[in-house]
């Protein structure tokens, strides 16, 4: 059973999450030859203030 964990900075709409799930599921099913119903996708939304780059917080 494939597990895919996606972390994004900021918030996504429900529609964006659904589109990501559809697209990622299609790619994993095709490339890994796994049944779509076995693919789990986790989307973690992270506040910009909790992400650092080059020694500084994004916000």
Region locations from a protein language model:
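A domain-level signal for the structural core that forms small-molecule/cofactor-binding pockets
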Residues: 2-59
């Amino acid at each position: 059973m494939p597990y895919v964990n996606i972390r994004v900075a900021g918030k996504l709409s429900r529609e964006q999450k659904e589109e990501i799930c559809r697209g990622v599921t299609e790619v994993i099913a095709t490339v890994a030859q796994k049944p779509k119903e076995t693919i789990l996708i986790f989307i973690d939304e992270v506040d910009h203030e909790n992400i650092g780059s080059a020694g500084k917080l994004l916000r």
